[in-house]
Amino acid sequence: MENFKTDFAKTLKESNLSEKEIAFKNLNAKEFSKQGFPNRKDEDWKFSDINQIIKKEIGELKFYTGQSKETDIDEDVLLGEIKHNKLIFVNGQLVQTDFSSEEISKIEFLDNKNDTEDQSVENSLINLNNALANKSYKLLVKKNYQIKNPLIIYHVSNNKVTSQNINLKINFELEENSSLKLIDLLKDKGNKNFINIFYNFSLEKNSVLKNYKIDQFENDNIRYMFNNIKQSSNSVSETFYLSKGSTFSKNEIFCDLKGEHSSAFVNGVFSLNKNKHHEIKAKINHLVENTKSYQSVSYTHLTLPTNREV
């Protein structure tokens, strides 16, 4: 944990943040230092001791990233078969955005929004993300607009990073009667890194979100992805996982169905060999009447059972 404290201090020193932003990051760093990485004593991690997995697979983890210059885009990772919008992250840094096929007045993408909430959360990996992510991004889809083409977020790591903690946070807001088809495409050449991704979704009345997470390509990384979803009336969220490539992957969904006739669906296909561990944990809270949820996960090859709860 001393390594984290040293790297956090270095990160904070090199950042240009307001007092409120610094206080927010200090609060989350303190919480992470207190809790550390989750282990089997935590009920939510009884199937996967990520603390021991990181020690075994990575060893000493580096938390300081700085602004790497090694963020060139390998054109081979880009999909040419379908027309799509793009956000390209290389080693956790945003290197390209492209919404040229959309009505630009109907969407907003902010790449300089830092969170300043003063509350902490009971999830040490979210604390870690809040402490070290250099900024949090926001995508707004405005009222009555359906994004024409899917948004593919390319999560790329290259062979310039190893034993590195990479953190990314994006907030998505779908206003009334809007829709978004979002594809997370994981393409890693960097190995033995811990990649920590946190998404916040706010779905207003009659909005529709479809999120496809594709972890297809073989890599030695350890990955944690958390979707926090808040849904108003008549909104729909659907999350689909193709989970295969990473050495270890845990995907969590925490969803509040706050409005009547809102619904949430989680589907997944896991194709793993006996040396990999992938897990989904979905908690969907039905806070009002007349809401609906459904979960279905199928496995091939030898793996541990899914941990699911409603």
Model-derived features with residue positions:
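Conserved beta-strand/loop scaffold segments within soluble protein domains that form the structured core
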Residues: 103, 110, 115-302, 308
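N-terminal leader/transition segments
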Residues: 1-168, 173, 177-179, 186
